[in-house]
């Protein structure tokens, strides 16, 4: 095997493993991590968890997508003309398309958030002084919705469900590419027999 043949085989291996990891990570996010956010006790903690998870996933998912698509493209162009199988190009396109899938899938638009009331709020000192006055009062009312900055749980649920759908689409596309890569590599390694007909 020549140096080019070895490097092409190595590139195919790296691309296939990266595509398999991308498929597994996308599936784990859509089936385990995102549904767990909906079971958090408050919508504020779910919203914070969603933003933290989204920010933490951008770099690894982009790296896996790049490591999945670039080796297949490079191996397609480095391979000798007789070994340039179209599955290399198709797999690279599917890996790239899996990163674009979340943009293409429509997400439900949450209703606009309620703006805070225009009435001036009490200063923190005034709130503290008022809390001493009603400390022993059994009939005191809890803080109103205006006093507590609240995040709508339905908005968070819509965001989580939209992100889950996009990661499921990413999983499906990358799984199709992974299956194509495995079958293609298996076909590359199959012994080629030449039959002469006389």
Swiss-Prot record:
How does it sit in the bilayer? Multi-pass membrane protein
Which ranges does the record mark as transmembrane?
A: 17-37, 60-80, 86-106, 171-191
Query: One of this protein's GO BP terms?
Result: macroautophagy
Does the entry feature the keyword Membrane, yes or no? yes
> Basic and acidic residues bias: where?
126-142
* Stretch list, region Disordered: 111-147
Q: What is its main location?
A: mitochondrion
Which UniProt keyword terms apply here? Autophagy, Membrane, Mitochondrion, Transmembrane, Transmembrane helix
| Cellular compartments annotated | Mitochondrion membrane
Statement: the UniProt record of this protein carries the keyword Mitochondrion: yes
The cellular component terms of Gene Ontology attached to this UniProt record, alphabetical and capped at eight, are: mitochondrial outer membrane
For this protein, the record's InterPro entries field holds: ATG33
| Compositional bias ranges of the Low complexity kind | 112-121
Protein family according to the UniProt entry: Belongs to the ATG33 family.
Biological role: Involved in the selective degradation of mitochondria via autophagy during starvation and at post-log phase. Autophagy is required for proper vegetative growth, asexual/sexual reproduction, and full virulence. Autophagy is particularly involved in the biosynthesis of deoxynivalenol (DON), an important virulence determinant.
Q: What is this protein called?
A: Autophagy-related protein 33
- Source organism per entry reads Gibberella zeae (strain ATCC MYA-4620 / CBS 123657 / FGSC 9075 / NRRL 31084 / PH-1) (Wheat head blight fungus)
